[in-house]
Amino acid sequence: MIMAAGSTGERPFFEIITSIRYWIIHAVTLPAIFIAGFLFVYTGLAYDAFGTPRPDSYFQSSESKAPVVTQRYEAKSQLDLRTK
């Protein structure tokens, strides 16, 4: 087969996205990826996987606002006092 200059030998993108085979495969995989991502976040597994606190655990129940660190070099000790 003789290819045109500059051709990589791959099918043109337009030909791929207009094929029935492409849409049969992607009609299943694209919604499946979306649903998997939704469930990953909705079930809380994303919080566990990445070690992020859940929205209801950012503040302690006794606090009414976000904790503020006032001394730059004593931040660790201030946060330790907060968690006790």
Curated annotation (Swiss-Prot):
**Needed cofactors:** heme b
TM segment ranges: 24-38
Q: Where does heme bind?
A: H26
- One GO location term (cellular component): plasma membrane-derived thylakoid membrane
Q: How does it sit in the membrane?
A: Single-pass membrane protein
How is the co-factor bound, per the entry?
Answer: With its partner (PsbF) binds heme. PSII binds additional chlorophylls, carotenoids and specific lipids.
Q: Name one GO biological process term.
A: photosynthetic electron transport chain
Q: Which UniProt keywords apply?
A: Electron transport, Heme, Iron, Membrane, Metal-binding, Photosynthesis, Photosystem II, Thylakoid, Transmembrane, Transmembrane helix, Transport
Matches recorded under Pfam families? Cytochrom_B559, Cytochrom_B559a
Q: Where in the cell is it found?
A: Cellular thylakoid membrane
Q: Which InterPro entries match?
A: PSII_cyt_b559_asu, PSII_cyt_b559_asu_sf, PSII_cyt_b559_N, PSII_cytb559_asu_lum
**Is the keyword NAD in the record?**
no
Chief location bin? membrane
Question: A GO molecular-function term, please?
Answer: electron transfer activity
Task: Determine if Transport is one of this entry's keywords.
Answer: yes
Superkingdom of this protein's organism: Bacteria
**Family assignment?**
Belongs to the PsbE/PsbF family.
Instruction: Please give the subunit comment from the record.
Output: Heterodimer of an alpha subunit and a beta subunit. PSII is composed of 1 copy each of membrane proteins PsbA, PsbB, PsbC, PsbD, PsbE, PsbF, PsbH, PsbI, PsbJ, PsbK, PsbL, PsbM, PsbT, PsbX, PsbY, Psb30/Ycf12, peripheral proteins PsbO, CyanoQ (PsbQ), PsbU, PsbV and a large number of cofactors. It forms dimeric complexes.
What the protein does? Answer: This b-type cytochrome is tightly associated with the reaction center of photosystem II (PSII). PSII is a light-driven water:plastoquinone oxidoreductase that uses light energy to abstract electrons from H(2)O, generating O(2) and a proton gradient subsequently used for ATP formation. It consists of a core antenna complex that captures photons, and an electron transfer chain that converts photonic excitation into a charge separation.
Q: What is this protein called?
A: Cytochrome b559 subunit alpha
The lineage is: Bacteria, Bacillati, Cyanobacteriota, Cyanophyceae, Synechococcales
- Name the gene that codes for it: psbE
